[in-house]
């Protein structure tokens, strides 16, 4: 079926790489396809073990810190919800965008971006590690659901459009323009699957659904990281109205976000400080009124940033369903600057805290220790699926990739138990 105004996606978008046999366990008279292909894909991600493991993986602070932790899983749920709301305004398939939000961090290792850094060091001589490329690897091979005619895993066997919607960086390390970028979306090992997904797509251009997911991710973590910082009393939003403090934040932001000038960031800080919902938070004291004010702040900022992208994109692209490569997401520069200010607040007052940096250093050391132990003792030190892959790996690079895949799959609790067993100490001694 070709695309139409009623259904802007076509059979090419809905194609799966491996043909699947019909289900056989249904009761007589109940056969039928009641869900769309993208709804089925969303369900596959939602029920995956890889998604559940995100409950014990760090977003900014550890999943066991505080009474209301934000984990990679809760963050992914928030991204999915924001993306779904944007999809309504743009005419994208709701299940497709929600799926992209759920899966956008599914390849994250223990300790989030800090764990990414450590695994990239471990695999530096053999293709490195990148969370976005690991997302794709999990969805197309590591998460068990479907096997091909040769008995090889096809991962969740998602549709082409679903896999593309999860792909923020549609290039491989060292390919074309991607060679000048730190982030990439595919490992060379997964080139064949990547070529299949990107067949007919404009080179190095993410589809609209992936762009929506990417902006929803930016909005979610910038707003919610600041919310967590306020609750933990690490961030005081009154700094936005203090010229000297705001100027220092703007200078830091100019260094971190080279595409946004200090003047733009100062102007953004002033705009944010003058919003009634920001002023209402004031000095947070955890009372009912303060908690309500903070929740209203997060709600209104998410709405501000998401609706600006919808309206600007609609103004540029016109009416009708906007899907795949029919449009690019348009976000006003002043809104990007406001989101950048929130990111700088989290960077300055949470991620640059000396205690946080010390914890991160210990986490990286732990990953290096466990990687050395697993590789030197493989295949006996590996889980059965990974041990089999290690035994059939063609060379040292492929064997190291298997070890990295296993570590990336660990929850933080499991990684710490393995490290504690190796050192012969209690887990508490490692904190």
UniProtKB/Swiss-Prot annotation:
Residues 1-36 are annotated as: Disordered. Residues 72-222 form the HD domain. SMART domains: HDc (SM00471). GO terms for biological process: dGTP catabolic process. PROSITE patterns: HD. It comes from the Bacteria. InterPro entries: dGTPase, dGTPase-like, dNTPase_2, HD/PDEase_dom, HD_domain, PHydrolase_assoc_dom. CDD domains: HDc (cd00077). One of its GO terms (cellular component) is plasma membrane. The keyword Hydrolase applies. GO terms for molecular function: dGTPase activity. Keywords: Acetylation, Hydrolase. The modification N-acetylserine is found at residue 2. Residues 1-20 have a biased composition (Basic and acidic residues). Belongs to the dGTPase family. Type 2 subfamily. This is Deoxyguanosinetriphosphate triphosphohydrolase-like protein. It comes from Mycobacterium tuberculosis (strain ATCC 25618 / H37Rv).
